[in-house]
Design a protein with these regions (language model features):
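Boundary at the C-terminal end of the N-terminal hydrophobic targeting segment
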Residues: 21-25
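Gly/Ala-rich beta-loop-alpha elbow adjacent to hydrolase catalytic centers
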Residues: 202-207, 211
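The feature captures the conserved acid-bearing segment of alpha/beta-hydrolase catalytic domains
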Residues: 80-81, 221-314
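Serine-hydrolase catalytic machinery in alpha/beta-hydrolase-like enzymes
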Residues: 94-192
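Catalytic active-site module of serine/aspartate enzymes centered on a nucleophile-bearing elbow/loop
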Residues: 300-334
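Bacterial N-terminal signal peptides
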Residues: 6-17
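N-terminal cap/lid segment of alpha/beta-hydrolase-fold proteins
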Residues: 28-82
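Short beta-strand element of the alpha/beta-hydrolase
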Residues: 85-94
Length: 334
């Protein structure tokens, strides 16, 4: 293995060899459903990262060789001037995506004072795709418990325990602590597991639902949900039990956003109210997607534009037009 650091532009910290195992994508049961059009992963060039920021790409299989699927690189960002007390932001991409797709949002997190991890995970199918058609509202709880913590039975997805989000994050933090001991990544672990009280969780689409579920089940530093977590039975509009349950994370730490024109805007607005997210902590995005985007026809570009590079609108200077909204949602990591 070869470790490296870039201060000015995105680099590969752990060399990715030709023998890397490609992700074996999961297949939704109803591939023609509108719910399957959440997000497709475009190929794009990462923007430059400002000087003074270290960026790593690390394969999930390098931190845990038993992980064979969904093996696109995790992205790690650290600003040189961060104090030792800086907290951690973990971002989860949407369905079919990878962390690099939302690099500008990750950079915004680093600029807000967090150490940042964009975490790859099993995201071939989402909860609304899988459990939305299921008449059992608890399908969503089983789905997310298995995908995130690896400790529930769900016949609807084939995720393995070692592929769980918690295991991926735990193994990555241990790996980073060995790779860069002077950065003390072990501060974000307790008894070998993620120290959620020092971790802000954020995500887009399916990833927003991941962040929300973790916030419901663990006391985290902050929850940032970009257009996610509307788990319900579509035929009856009955919410998943976890949506209506009490939150382990105090509600004043919850933040969320959605686009007023995205197809599931009404569902998200209702879900955020049921969860109890303070109305002052919710941003409704209104700008048109970047007209130069290269996304396939038929996708909900308003939904994708919340954080995805090439679709997120830009200002007159070519910078993300939602920068101020992102900064509000992120708060301070220091």
């Amino acid at each position: 293995m070869h470790a490296g650091v870039c201060a000015a532009a995105l680099c590969v910290a752990i060399a990715i060899g030709a023998g890397s195992v490609a992700a074996q994508e999961q297949t939704p049961k109803e591939s023609k459903s509108e719910l399957t059009k959440e997000l497709l992963a475009p190929i794009h060039t990462s923007p430059d990262v400002a000087p003074g920021m270290q960026v790593y790409q690390i394969l999930p299989s390098d931190v845990d060789p038993s992980i064979k699927r969904f093996n696109k690189p995790n992205i790690v960002l650290v600003k040189d001037d961060l104090p030792p007390t800086a907290n951690l932001l973990v971002f989860f991409p949407g369905t079919g995506g990878d962390p690099n797709m939302s690099l500008p949002f990750l950079i915004a997190g680093a600029n807000a004072g967090y150490r940042v991890i964009g975490l790859m995970y099993d995201n071939g199918v989402s909860d609304p795709q899988t459990c939305g058609p299921n008449p059992d509202p608890a399908c969503s709880d089983r789905f997310r418990e298995k995908r995130i913590f690896g400790d529930a039975e769900s016949a609807d997805i084939d995720d393995l325990p070692n592929e769980s989000i918690e295991n991926r994050l735990m193994k990555l933090l241990h790996y980073l602590d060995q790779l860069q001991p002077d950065q003390h990544w072990g501060r974000y672990l307790t008894s070998g597991l993620p120290n959620w009280s020092r971790i802000a969780v954020a995500g887009h689409s399916q990833g927003g639902g991941v962040a929300a579920y973790i916030g419901k089940k663990r006391v985290v530093l902050r929850v940032i949900n970009l257009s996610g977590a509307w788990d319900r039975v579509e035929a009856t509009k009955v919410w998943a039990p976890w949506i209506t349950s009490a939150s382990a994370t105090p509600l004043d730490r919850w933040y969320a956003a959605y686009h007023q024109k995205e197809s599931r805007a009404d569902a998200m607005k209702a879900a955020y109210a049921v969860i109890g997210i303070p109305s002052a902590h919710i941003r409704v995005f209104t700008l048109e997607p970047n007209p130069a985007n290269k996304m396939p026809a038929g996708l909900d570009l308003y939904h994708v534009s919340m954080s995805v590079t090439g679709v997120t609108p830009l200002d007159a200077n070519g910078q993300p037009a939602y920068a101020a909204d992102w900064a509000f949602l992120l708060g301070s990591g220091k």
